[in-house]
């Protein structure tokens, strides 16, 4: 019942409840806002327990690029890239992430504690600085994820009639946002 927002938009939709905070690439985050209590209900029925708003970085005068490579002891690998630049009245940000998590059976009971997961995120945003007080931002985020968990023999393609339990989930999310801002007074 916690509403997750990206730059004030409900970008995660009904998937927020099943989304782990570890699945949100941190490279483009400028800050995180948390609203709890009765004030959160202003964001709708999905915000009864609170709101978490992830605020992205905006282009600065100097170019910025960050590459993050991560390998876990639980057989997971991540590669993330963030780049941003402002060129006069135009700016951009680009975030990309690839994740692979091998199926992992921590307690060796024959069932995966972590599913086999492939995921990919690409998120470009364009900033148009029309004048000192007016800005237009257009962005798109596409996320693909393929998960398969359950009986380790089934996941690895060795399942028989007695080994049939598994769960598979393939999801594609595409969110396009546009934000027009006009400052009325300074």
Predicted regions and their residues:
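Outer-envelope beta-barrel architecture signal
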Residues: 2, 61-65, 77, 88-92, ...
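Short acidic/polar hinge/loop motifs at secondary-structure boundaries
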Residues: 2, 9-36
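Structural signature of outer-membrane beta-barrel domains
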Residues: 11, 57, 72-74, 99-103, ...
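Transmembrane beta-barrel architecture of outer-membrane proteins
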Residues: 19, 47-49, 70, 76-78, ...
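Short strand-turn segments of transmembrane beta-barrel domains in outer membranes
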Residues: 38-39, 51, 56-85, 115
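Residue-level signature of outer-membrane beta-barrel architecture
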Residues: 56, 84-87, 126-128, 180-184
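Transmembrane beta-barrel strands of outer-membrane/channel proteins
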Residues: 67-71, 81, 94-100, 138-144
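Flexible loop and strand-edge segments within Gram-negative outer membrane beta-barrel domains
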Residues: 101-121, 129-186
